[in-house]
């Protein structure tokens, strides 16, 4: 029995590096190392490109689940991912690496005008999103189709 601890990682590259663990399990160490090296190179190139951005768009993350909206705290890998892309993550001031459980009203108050909405769940279309929760229509990022 092995326990996968990738959820403990605090950086995007830390999460990607778990490919080496799985490569070792299947005797594919060299291939996994090569894949990770490529991911690392491309990630760092993308971060360098993002630093030239002229704007810092606001970013909303997640969606409702069991009447709660879960978002990552400010020191999580997801927040770092957005920060390195020059995004303005709306809960970046929240200390820690876990998640926050928020009400819809709290999220709407803070993120109604967010420029982008990422990771909204397993919806196949914007229509499917709004069919699941009509209140999603209140977010400007959805209205602008920046989801």
Kindly label every feature range from the protein language model.
Residues 2, 90-92, 147:
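General small-molecule cofactor/ligand-binding pocket signal
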Residues 23, 32, 85-87, 91, ...:
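Small-side-chain structural scaffolding
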Residues 41-134:
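Flexible, glycine-rich surface segments
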Residues 10-17, 24, 119-147:
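Structured C-terminal subdomain patch of bacterial secreted/periplasmic proteins
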Residues 12-13, 20-24, 69-84, 146-147:
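Extracytoplasmic metal-acquisition and chelation regions
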